[in-house]
Amino acid sequence: MSGGSQVHIFWGAPVAPLKMTVSQDTASLMSVADPWKKIHLLYSQHSLYLKDEKQHKNLENYEVPESVGSPDFSGHFLANCMNRHVHVKDDFVRSVSETQNIESQNIHSSRLSDITSSNMQICGFKSTVPHLTEEEKYQKLLSENKIIDEQPKHQSDICGQNFNTNLFQLGHKCAAMLDLVCSTEQINIGPEVVQRECVSTEYHEIQNQCLGLFSSNAVDKSRSEAAVRKASDLKISTDTEFLSIITSSQVAFLAQKKDKGRSPINKGNVNMETEPKASYREIRIPEENSIQLDGFTEAYEGGQNQAYSLELFSPVCRKTENSRIHINSDKGLEEHIGSQELFNSEDKLPPNEIHIELCSSGILCSQLNTFHKSAIKRSCTSEDKVGQSEALSRVLQVAKKMKLISNGGDSAVEMDRRNVSEFKGIKKTSLIKNCDSKSQKYNCLVMVLSPCHVKEINIKFGPNSGSKVPLATVTVIDQSETKKKVFLWRTAAFWAFTVFLGDIILLTDVVIREDQWVGETVLQSTFSSQLLNLGSYSSIQPEEYSSVVSDVVLQDLLAYVSSKHSYLRDLPPRQPQRVNSIDFVELEHLQPDVLVHAVLRVVDFTILTEAVYSYRGQKQKKVMLTVEQAQDQHYVLVLWGPGAAWYPQLQRKKGYIWEFKYLFVQRNYTLENLELHTTPWSSCECLFNDDIRAITFKAKFQKSAPSFVKIPDLATHLEDKCSGVVLIQAQISELAFPITAAQKIALNAHSSLKSIFSSLPNIVYTGCAKCGLELETDENRIYKQCFSCLPFTMKKIYYRPALMTVVDGRHDVCIRVESKLIEKILLNISADCLNRVIVPSSEITYGMVVADLFHSLLAVSAEPCVLKIQSLFVLDENSYPLQQDFSLLDFYSDIVKHGADARL
């Protein structure tokens, strides 16, 4: 027995670090009572034993996948071994299925010598294992767990790092185990860097990050660094943010399930259809419109498929080129749960679509299977790398058979009037305390105690490096007085947006999993899981759900909640929002998680080039608008999906008044403010000045405008010689555009329309897109770079700044006008659009429109304008003006028509 290979495995690590790794920061930490435990894993040609210090025990009742031919030892060896079983106390029962007819492959002698000469302790695996409880709200810090695996001298035994008690394989000379427990690559776990030798790191990495999300951070030398790291971990990708908005807005529609007969939405499903033609004032989204997501690389798109849980998240080693992973779904998932076996057969790939619909029993969340059944054969080669850009998960089919209709001025969403979906009743449910078998799926009727936000797990190594896996946890309880956490993985994580405190939910096809790090068991979603939200505790009538679940079980749950959680009765009932009665709101009265209409003035635009998400199979940048209803009270409106196509039109009409419909209000927990987001049902309309909605908006907007010095005319202002911000009413007589020190272009009432049009190329220039500095050209007519803005090298066309001469009676002054205000005077027509035609079938260009605007503005018969200017007077001791300077701050061309006094 002593001649066989030995693997020494230590488990039961204390909370506090070992003495050899203790620093001053961890000196005060308490260690646990349980000491280290030591067993000897002895392996020979025909047997496998786990030898404790006092007794021998055998493993049983577990199976593992067939070994994938390990390349870790030289020589060919044909192993014909029988299954050996070992029992170990303290829940250390794991499967070991020795491989049959598995040929070990040759390896290079250099690697063999490296392995056999590793006569040292491997102490590098320092995993930050935080544990946060629900009551502490992710704030209490625990110490690090240090797992140290030893290897005695004068032996060629391979030490195991990060021993995974859920899955390991044994072949000749522990070859298969080496694929899981040994490593050659680096993994960042918390602040430490450890050395590993296998590419199958994604499972351990995701597991550690999962603990980091649902636990507090470990003690670090710098608390501030830990806080920064925690804040960065909570940040989600733009893809997840996009899908969160889509899901939350969908839930806002479906929240009116209690009014099945009266609601205009009888089936509110994320997958909707669009009719081919659009009538007046209707906005339709194309049928091929689909929202695809890159961020959720779930391995099944590239053929690297797991069963349903994170514990089967076992990526393939790149070095084992002959290994293939297949999953057989024909035998049913029930046969695969207890074993960790990967079958070589055809597979119907697991579903990865969010599907939310209104059924007769409540809001049903499920996952749609969009993949057809096909044979999956995956070779672990470099061609099979599934990156974040390749794992496009079709999550939503947006806007099929859905339209916005304007009927008598009131917009409502008219959707398919089919009968609501029926949810097949599940009479057999299990209490949480009875969910103890890992080889069985359970249906649980529970109450939600605490939902949470969707988080993400970053995959840093392996074939799926760079991708992210969404994760949410919901704490539930039932009449057995057992509280459990439910882990919702991947697309199921977005179901967390459909549940609230006190909701009664039915979870189907969930499995039990043991979190070996935290030491608790959790419920976990599978690819076939569904979630049915019956509603809040206070609004449920058991007889209404007799066709779904047993009324006895439901009554018992309600009775338990009433006696043990009576505080839920005092929660105000959620008021479902009526789609046909969505109101126009004022921004200062916004409420989160509702759909609203709003009339807004667009102030500015921001495009986040690094915030990219997938929409209709393409990368799309996040577009944010700055809008206002009151002077200088700005809010954020984010354009998602189809709404991003509005950006060019909104940019051309910057400063105009727009009507937006079906916006979703969500709280930004980073900035602690409310933001508006477009939905697949949103629409926008630019309002003309004579529109009653625009007139009403201006009346409210002008009341909120700050008070200016009221000046009746220009002469009075020049006589008072007061510096400050003033409003004056005057007529524009000339616009002069300096080109060089000795050359300028002057436009006035005597300029013809033709001469103005021919002058347009000279009143624009090409400058730095960041600072606006005019760029010179070299001898090859190539623009030079703006050195002050490097490495930013983008260019943009601007209007030249001008000197505006205004006249009021016998007095005239010159006012400096910046490039942005020239663009505003020209109805926000950008300088780079002058050569574009307005519509493809027309020959009229934007340059012609700009020339006509200049000609009308400078005409003798032109109406006077109201100008907001900044005036500066420098006076001597006799109040004689030594210097006077005027700068234009804003321009109001139509305010005189409605009365300048209203503005003042």
Swiss-Prot record:
This is Shieldin complex subunit 2. InterPro entries: FAM35A (IPR029715), SHLD2_C (IPR031589), SHLD2_OB1 (IPR049507), SHLD2_OB2 (IPR053944). Residues 1-568 are annotated as: Interaction with ASTE1. GO terms for biological process: DNA repair; regulation of double-strand break repair via homologous recombination. It comes from Pongo abelii (Sumatran orangutan). It holds the Pfam family SHLD2_OB1. Component of the shieldin complex, consisting of SHLD1, SHLD2, SHLD3 and MAD2L2/REV7. Within the complex, SHLD2 forms a scaffold which interacts with a SHLD3-MAD2L2 subcomplex via its N-terminus, and with SHLD1 via its C-terminus. Interacts with TP53BP1. Interacts with RIF1. Interacts with ASTE1. It is found in: Chromosome. Keywords: Chromosome, DNA damage, DNA repair. GO terms for cellular component: nucleus; site of double-strand break. Component of the shieldin complex, which plays an important role in repair of DNA double-stranded breaks (DSBs). During G1 and S phase of the cell cycle, the complex functions downstream of TP53BP1 to promote non-homologous end joining (NHEJ) and suppress DNA end resection. Mediates various NHEJ-dependent processes including immunoglobulin class-switch recombination, and fusion of unprotected telomeres. The keyword Metal-binding does not apply. Residues 1-60 are annotated as: Sufficient for interaction with SHLD3 and MAD2L2. Its main location: nucleus. The keyword Heme does not apply. Belongs to the SHLD2 family. Residues 721-891 are annotated as: Mediates interaction with SHLD1.
